[in-house]
């Protein structure tokens, strides 16, 4: 289980997250949703230990080892003009296990190729990444995370800018992973899709306003507070809360 207790983050003297609490069991698929600036990316980065924070974050009761977490950052965060191919990008996700400047062993190559097969990119393993489309790049980043065979997978806006077939491919994959026991935490702006796809939702706006099964989050006032909107906002109608 992932447990986040009383997590607070300050960046540049500004409070970004305040006393966030979250629990995510193995095999659960949770959507992390909230408005722009709500702290979704910061929360994922805090779980990884990439930003200073107060409070506690544990996985299976132990301090988190970020080398064992699968993490898919937003696509623009990766240097796509770097002169490497698809397989090398996926292998870069294993750097924590390989160490710097060490050649990958056969089991590492096998893990990378298996991950590429999971995202239907095996036939492009030798292609330079600068030649990939946006959807292909996103699938490579997912494969990079999956090469670790993680039990905890963090996804930061994985569907941004993707066409519908790619979104469906990745959604099916994330559901399969959760059904196989992987804990999946995904930030997303697609609220309607998150409501339909994710077993659990966490509503975040600098603090957690609710974390519960998506079928139970029907309180209109709660969504209004999360997104700071009026009762007649079309967003609430789209979510079935007219």
Predicted segments, located by residue:
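Conserved ABC ATPase "signature" region
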Residues: 106-124
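H-loop/switch region of ABC-family ATPase nucleotide-binding domains
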Residues: 188-189
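Conserved ABC transporter NBD signature motif
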Residues: 52-69
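H-loop (His-switch) and adjacent beta-strand-loop-beta switch element
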Residues: 200-214
């Amino acid at each position: 289980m992932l447990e986040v207790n009383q997590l607070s983050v300050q960046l540049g003297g500004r409070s970004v997250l305040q006393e966030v609490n979250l629990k995510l069991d193995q095999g659960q698929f949770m959507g992390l949703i909230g408005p722009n600036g709500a702290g979704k990316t910061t929360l994922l980065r805090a779980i990884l230990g990439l930003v200073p924070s107060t409070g506690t974050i544990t996985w299976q009761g132990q301090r988190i080892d970020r080398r064992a977490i699968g993490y898919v950052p937003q696509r623009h965060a990766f240097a796509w003009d770097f002169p490497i191919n698809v397989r090398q990008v996926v292998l870069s996700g294993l750097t924590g296990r390989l160490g710097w400047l060490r050649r990958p062993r056969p089991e590492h190559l096998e893990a990378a190729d298996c991950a590429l097969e999971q995202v239907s990119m095996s036939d492009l393993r030798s292609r330079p990444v600068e030649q990939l489309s946006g959807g292909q790049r996103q699938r490579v980043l997912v494969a990079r995370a999956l090469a670790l065979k993680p039990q905890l997978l963090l996804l930061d806006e994985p569907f941004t800018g993707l066409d519908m077939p790619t979104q469906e491919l990745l959604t099916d994959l994330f559901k399969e992973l959760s059904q196989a026991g992987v804990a999946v935490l995904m930030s997303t702006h697609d609220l309607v899709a998150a409501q339909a796809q994710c077993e659990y939702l966490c509503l975040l706006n600098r603090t957690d306003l609710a974390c519960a099964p998506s079928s139970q989050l029907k309180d209109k006032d709660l969504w209004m507070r999360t997104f700071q909107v009026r009762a007649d906002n079309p967003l609430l109608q789209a979510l079935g809360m007219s």
